[in-house]
A protein has these predicted regions:
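P-loop/Walker A NTP-binding region and its immediately flanking N-terminal helices
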Residues: 1-149
């Protein structure tokens, strides 16, 4: 996680992050903290303020530019395409539009292909935060486009 904090501090921000580890280890918590760091009103930071509107709304789960998806319940390619249809639009409030896809390994093969197209040429204003308990089930084409952190 030091590498993640250093990257934010230096402004080296990747377009896709993969957090893997056992259930309950904090994958989505770290992803939400990263979303705060990317969208904090005080600027891109490894230590978001936690008090600005953006940080508070992310904490409360109601920040319009943080789109959270549970892939376990949305495995179909149509769900993924619906999600990705909005990728080209700029963020409404934040610096970045952040897509947090939990249990990403549950997506179908066709869904992975749809996601891959966006990961190959992501808009500058979009960041993908992927979380999984089973990274071995992810296609190598997805893995190769993500900065990976095993927790």
């Amino acid at each position: 996680l030091t590498a993640l904090a250093n990257g934010l501090s230096l402004g080296r921000i990747h377009h896709a992050y993969l957090f893997s580890g056992t259930r309950g280890v904090g994958k989505t918590s770290i992803a939400r903290l990263l979303a705060k760091g990317l969208n904090c009103e005080s600027g891109i930071t490894a230590t978001p303020c936690g008090v600005c509107d953006n940080c508070r709304e992310i904490e409360q789960g109601r920040f319009v530019d943080l789109i959270e998806i549970d892939a376990a319940s949305r495995t179909k390619v149509e769900d993924t395409r619906d999600l990705l249809d909005n990728v080209q639009y700029a963020p409404a409030r934040g610096r970045f539009k952040v897509y947090l896809i939990d249990e990403v390994h549950m997506l179908s093969r066709h869904s992975f292909n749809a996601l891959l197209k966006t990961l190959e040429e992501p808009p500058a204003h979009v960041k993908f935060l992927l979380a999984t308990t089973d990274p071995q089930k992810l296609p190598v084409t997805i893995l190769s486009r993500c900065l990976q952190f095993h927790l």
